[in-house]
Curated annotation (Swiss-Prot):
SMART domains on file: EXOIII
Organism, scientific name: Bos taurus (Bovine)
A Gene Ontology molecular function term of the record: nucleic acid binding
Gene this chain is encoded by: ERI3
Protein name (database record): ERI1 exoribonuclease 3
Record EC number: 3.1.-.-
Entries under InterPro entries matching the protein: 3-5_Exoribonuclease, ERI-1_3'hExo-like, Exonuclease_RNaseT/DNA_pol3, RNaseH-like_sf, RNaseH_sf
Length: 337
């Protein structure tokens, strides 16, 4: 897949133009639905963030410590990242975008939100809630879609060879909203070791009846291709990339089994993001225990059953969404084949 190219406006382009915006991660906080109340944050709209407690005596004091740092437009491909910056100022580019969305009366000449007359505030408030909902998104990513994948395979102690994929889940994650838009999920019948071991069933939760009579890997790969086409992911103008928890799935497991069976590996499986590497870039530490460490480091609850392929995909998607909220831009980590 093609890599993103900088947009003409200095990298602040929309994702479908190949641009991206990057800024330091901001701590999660509540942004008010309106600035009509006597204090900052009186009418909070949460969007999943913990509430922010600020002194209510002086609105001006509150305004002095926060800068609405990144406001692009109402396309939904932007986010507000309030930062504790002291003397906050907008660039002329960001200010012009902010005024288009919020209305110029909400801003002083220097770009800092100010409390205007009651009539002006009421006028601006009519469309403010909808504008905030559109703006309160994520930093533009390099890809339109992330395809979250996590295989489960036959296994035993000691390890059996060759291993065979028995669960094949993919979540289509929108790169703008970081929401799951579509799911591909199939079980695969192993052919070399058709009988699952007790160790495998205990680890993955997959019982024999779940794989008996299921399609072969070749048939599943054909259905993956059909699903990719149906979802518009094969369009050359759509940028997408797989995301895995580690390199094993697409560097070892899939190419190894395809080689054993004499099957080709589609090009879209040859580029991916290793979530462990992305997390280490964002958080500054390596998640030794994979998803468990990443969920713990981000104060997230683990979803579902460990080593369930589809549940692991949901955890990966949740971790990605949380990192994106903090301003992280995901980049390909795999090297070209």
């Amino acid at each position: 897949m093609a890599t993103a190219s900088p947009a003409a406006d200095g990298g602040r382009g929309r994702p479908w133009e190949g641009g991206l915006v990057s800024w330091p991660p901001a701590p999660p906080l509540t942004i008010p639905w309106t600035w009509m109340g006597p204090s900052w944050g009186q009418h909070p709209g949460h969007w999943g963030f913990p509430a922010l407690t600020e002194p209510s005596a002086s609105p001006a004091a509150s305004l002095g410590i926060f800068e609405v740092r990144r406001v692009l437009d109402a396309s939904g491909c932007s986010m507000l990242a309030p930062l504790q910056t002291g003397a906050a100022r907008f660039s002329s580019y960001l200010l012009s975008r902010a005024r288009k969305v919020l209305g110029s009366h909400l801003f002083s000449p220097c770009g800092v939100p100010e409390f205007c007359s009651i009539s002006t505030r009421k006028l601006a408030a009519h469309s403010f809630g909808a504008s905030m909902a559109a703006m309160m998104s994520f930093p533009p990513q390099r890809y339109h879609y992330f395809l979250v994948l996590d295989f489960e395979a036959t296994c035993d102690k000691p390890q059996i060879h060759p291993q065979e994929i028995i669960e094949f889940p993919i979540l289509k994650l929108n790169g703008r909203t970081m929401e799951i838009e579509s799911t591909f999920h199939m079980y695969v019948q192993p052919v070399v070791h058709p009988q699952l071991t007790p160790f495998c069933t205990e680890l993955t939760g997959i019982i024999q009846a779940m794989v008996d009579g299921q399609p072969s890997l070749q048939q599943v790969l054909e259905r993956v291709d059909e699903w990719m086409a149906k979802e518009g992911l094969l369009d050359p103008n759509v940028k997408s990339i797989f995301v895995t928890c580690g390199d094993w799935d697409l560097k070892v497991m899939l190419p190894g089994q395809c080689q054993y069976l004499g099957l080709p590996v589609a090009d879209y499986f040859k580029q991916w993001i290793n979530l462990k590497k992305a997390y280490s870039f964002a958080m500054g530490c390596w998640p030794k225990n994979g998803l468990l460490d990443m969920n713990k480091g981000l104060s997230l609850q683990h979803i579902g059953r460990p080593h369930s392929g589809i549940d692991d995909c949901k955890n990966i998607a949740n971790i990605m969404k949380t990192l994106a909220y903090r301003g992280f831009i995901f980049k390909q980590t795999s090297k070209p084949f």
